[in-house]
């Protein structure tokens, strides 16, 4: 019995040694699910001779009878073919169309006294549920492979990111830059096959935007999409958080159907206007400090879980002059690195601070500029003209007092004049009345120099 053990070991070693020789010459071909593959078989004689293709179960797939193509009873019957034009050259190909994972097998070509074996491994790579995904969602790629295989997969995204894995690859938090063609390579037995998958990330072109406006100017908000779909249906809403308000509120709601926009509800203050076609476009009639703040536009697409988001910010500037103070202010979300300045035209800045309000006391006459800038780049500018003032601050008040006194004196003088004139007329009227009475009574008046001849009674 002890002598039998070494013999069995020797037999096993011989089998292992002979195994590579039995499989020597077997070619490995990788195919893609749904594609077409050509398995080659070349005869030593460059002429048309009889050949047969069989599977590992020795079931005939196809062959020839002279110049005619014959097919066997295999499950591939309606999906196989051969290039007859190459038979005369001793090339007898097996063409398998619309490959399936279950087509993975060892195919045997018998031509003349030759026998060739080709191992076909069919792989499939598919994306989870849909290739149209919302920004921020996860992408999962699943590899279908034949039993017994142990492939590795490496994918490269459009933005150049490499992902490696086995039969499942996952990418979380998709970004807009991930939209495009993904190239995935499957490796098996030192052979490789390449897949290309088109992924569309549904998103706005910009995650956020900021609009700078002077007080009173018209404001335009635009929300262009980063993708194109023939039939786009959904609904959206713009919520706004004003800087001066304690809570946010809905400014407008709308529906989207076949790229046409219809407004469902809009606030009266402010009363936004919305374009009727894509891209989504909103108009605010006037930029006012009470509207400065941040908004969030959401778009829910039909048959999609989740929403698209775009943040929009409004910064409003106001330049005012009140008595001796020239003020420049901004409202809305601004970066701490932004600089606010007040300067006289063509001169150096009088004041420049990283704050939301600056001012100048007793400003010189001329055109003043209120500037909001970032690293020297002017983002917003508002001009205000300061008129010349009096040399001393007392004179305007003195003129007002003097004017008031002069007006009062003139009023009193006119009153006295009219009063004296009225009194004089009344006295003159009394005298005339007295003269008439005396004349009617034939009495002399009290004026002897005029009526002395008629002073005595008749």
From Swiss-Prot:
Disulfide bonds join 41-109, 155-184, 328-370. Residues 26-125 form the Ig-like V-type domain. This is T-cell surface glycoprotein CD4. Residues 126-203, 204-317, 318-374 form the Ig-like C2-type domain. Integral membrane glycoprotein that plays an essential role in the immune response and serves multiple functions in responses against both external and internal offenses. In T-cells, functions primarily as a coreceptor for MHC class II molecule:peptide complex. The antigens presented by class II peptides are derived from extracellular proteins while class I peptides are derived from cytosolic proteins. Interacts simultaneously with the T-cell receptor (TCR) and the MHC class II presented by antigen presenting cells (APCs). SMART domains: IG, IGc2, IGv. It is a single-pass type I membrane protein. Keywords: Adaptive immunity, Cell membrane, Disulfide bond, Glycoprotein, Immunity, Immunoglobulin domain, Lipoprotein, Membrane, Palmitate, Phosphoprotein, Repeat, Signal, Transmembrane, Transmembrane helix. Its main location: membrane. The chain crosses the membrane at residues 397-418. GO terms for cellular component: endoplasmic reticulum lumen; endoplasmic reticulum membrane; external side of plasma membrane; membrane raft. It is found in: Cell membrane. Residues 1-25 form the signal peptide. One of its GO terms (molecular function) is interleukin-16 binding. InterPro entries: CD4, CD4-extracel, Ig-like_dom, Ig-like_dom_sf, Ig-like_fold, Ig_C2-set, Ig_sub, Ig_sub2. The modification Phosphoserine is found at residues 433, 440, 456. The keyword RNA-binding does not apply. PANTHER family: T-CELL SURFACE GLYCOPROTEIN CD4 (PTHR11422:SF0).
């Amino acid at each position: 019995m002890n002598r039998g053990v070494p013999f069995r070991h020797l037999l096993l070693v011989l089998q292992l040694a002979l195994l590579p020789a039995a499989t020597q010459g077997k070619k490995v071909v990788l195919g893609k699910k749904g594609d077409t593959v050509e398995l080659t078989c070349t005869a030593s004689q460059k002429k048309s001779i009889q050949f047969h293709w069989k599977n590992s179960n020795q079931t005939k797939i196809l062959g020839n009878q002279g110049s005619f193509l014959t097919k066997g009873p295999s499950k591939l019957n309606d999906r196989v073919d051969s290039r007859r034009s190459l038979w005369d050259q001793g090339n007898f190909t097996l063409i398998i169309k619309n490959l399936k994972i279950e087509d993975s097998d060892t195919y045997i070509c018998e031509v003349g006294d030759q026998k060739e074996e080709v191992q076909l491994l069919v792989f499939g790579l598919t994306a989870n549920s849909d290739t149209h995904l919302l920004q921020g969602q996860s992408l999962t790629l699943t590899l279908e492979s034949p039993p017994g295989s142990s492939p590795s997969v490496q994918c490269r995204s459009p933005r150049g990111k490499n992902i490696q894995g086995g039969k499942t690859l996952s990418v979380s938090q998709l970004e807009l830059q991930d939209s495009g063609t993904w190239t995935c390579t499957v490796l098996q037995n030192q052979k490789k096959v390449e897949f290309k998958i088109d992924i569309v990330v549904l998103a706005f072109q910009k995650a956020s935007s900021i609009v700078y406006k002077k007080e009173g100017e018209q404001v335009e908000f635009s929300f262009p999409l980063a993708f194109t779909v023939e039939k786009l249906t959904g609904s959206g809403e713009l919520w706004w958080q004003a800087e001066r308000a304690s809570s946010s509120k809905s400014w407008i709601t709308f529906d989207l159907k076949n790229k046409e926009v219809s407004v469902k509800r809009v606030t009266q203050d402010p009363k936004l206007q919305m374009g009727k076609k894509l891209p989504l476009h909103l108009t605010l009639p006037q930029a006012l400090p009470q509207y400065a703040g941040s908004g969030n536009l959401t778009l829910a697409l039909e048959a999609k879980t989740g929403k698209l988001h775009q943040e929009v910010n409004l910064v409003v500037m106001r330049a005012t002059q009140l008595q001796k103070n020239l003020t420049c202010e901004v409202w809305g979300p601004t970066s701490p690195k932004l600089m606010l300045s007040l300067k006289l035209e063509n001169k150096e800045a009088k004041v420049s601070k990283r704050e939301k309000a600056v001012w100048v006391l007793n400003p010189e006459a001329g055109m003043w500029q209120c500037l909001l800038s970032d690293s020297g780049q002017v983002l917003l500018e508002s001009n205000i003209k300061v008129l010349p003032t009096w040399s001393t601050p007392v004179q305007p008040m003195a003129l007002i007092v003097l004017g008031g006194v002069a007006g009062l004196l003139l009023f009193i003088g006119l009153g006295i004049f009219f009063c004296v004139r009225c009194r004089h007329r009344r006295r003159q009227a009394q005298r005339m009345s007295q003269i008439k009475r005396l004349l009617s009574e034939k009495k002399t008046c009290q004026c002897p120099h005029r009526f002395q001849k008629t002073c005595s009674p008749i």
